[in-house]
């Protein structure tokens, strides 16, 4: 009994015993049969202990399974504990001796804290029969995912590691597969749903941001369009006002022109239709009419100065054009009135006695003779009389001759002195006595050239004859040496140099002769005396 109790105390916890004691776990050797026959009493006690131990193991398994299913966090812990212990178990060979010394660690499928370690110093004598291995139902091949060292080595270096029972292996592998299936079956749709929700949320956000941007751009465009519309309306109003002002000014200018034309036309009709009494009225009326026009122009200028502040450059240009037209009309009216009033003034004016009066009368007559062409009132076609100026000899109309003669006499009588800067600088200095205060050198009167055209003609004919003779001789094939030498042609205009007897043109001779004189008058160089 003491030996059995000792055996039970040292029995490993992780060993999976068979359920039925009658079933043989595997093939038996001859030594095992002899051992069983001799010790049958011990076998009965072993069977009783095995049954008790199996019941405890089953109860512990049920508790662990309940805890694993109730607490999902322990699933990962159990899985982490189960894998390394499964990989650390190695099977012994069938022919190996089971009674050898073994110091390995034995673990269960549960956590390590529930099962104590086996004592390394105690040795359990077993038969060669392997406990917990059913040869009729072989186990599935174990896949070693992680190699785990037991961490404790025996004294002799041999480790007898007992394998896990087949039920625990099957249960752990099935539990692992079930957990993986549950985890993947639960996690995959959840992750897919989360990813789909995130994608939809991102799309919604992007669409919302784009919509906000488009709305902001549309609002900014609407504001710009409103501003531009307001500006265009203001510009249209301004242009309409300017056009109205221009139209009113044009209408006023047309009315003024019509009034002036009427004033010009009515006096002519009065002059043509009325008698001599009306002519006297026409003679003296222009002064009053001119005063009225002058006062009216002043009033218009004042009104223009007032409106100038609020007027545009186009309006100013229109006003200037109108003013020029008005001035031209006034000038033409004055000319017409002067022409009409001159005959009547001649009737009342006394005869002039001075020669200036005669000139004025002739000038008036000439102006009257020239005027009908522009006015069209008289049809005379007399030519204008011209008078010659006694100072410059030019001809002018008689009414312009007097004015020109006065100006021309002043210009011809006054002789302006030319300012000499050298004399002004030298005045009052020692240089004044050395300067030659001569007037400007008068241009030398060149003598008239002699007309030597006959000599030139004769020399030209002589050269032509000599050239013909030479051509005839060459045509016959004779020698030219028999002909007399050709004399050089003498140009009568050329001047012969007295020093070198060469002929030069007059201007060239003037430069050549003094140079040639100095060259010829030089003394000869001294002779060299050779020793």
From Swiss-Prot:
The keyword Magnesium does not apply. GO terms for molecular function: zinc ion binding. It comes from Macaca fascicularis. Residues 35-44, 366-380 have a biased composition (Low complexity). Residues 16-45, 290-318, 334-387 are annotated as: Disordered. Zn(2+) 2 binds at residues 497, 500, 512, 516. A zinc finger (C2HC/C3H-type) spans 385-414, 493-522. Keywords: Coiled coil, Metal-binding, Repeat, Zinc, Zinc-finger. Belongs to the ZC2HC1 family. This is Zinc finger C2HC domain-containing protein 1C. Pfam families: zf-C2HC_2. Residues 306-315 have a biased composition (Polar residues). Residues 293-305, 335-345 have a biased composition (Basic and acidic residues). InterPro entries: Znf_C2HC_C3H, ZNF_C2HC_dom_1C. Zn(2+) 1 binds at residues 389, 392, 404, 408. Its cofactor is Zn(2+). The keyword Metal-binding applies. It comes from the Eukaryota. PANTHER family: ZINC FINGER C2HC DOMAIN-CONTAINING PROTEIN 1C. Residues 209-264 form a coiled coil.
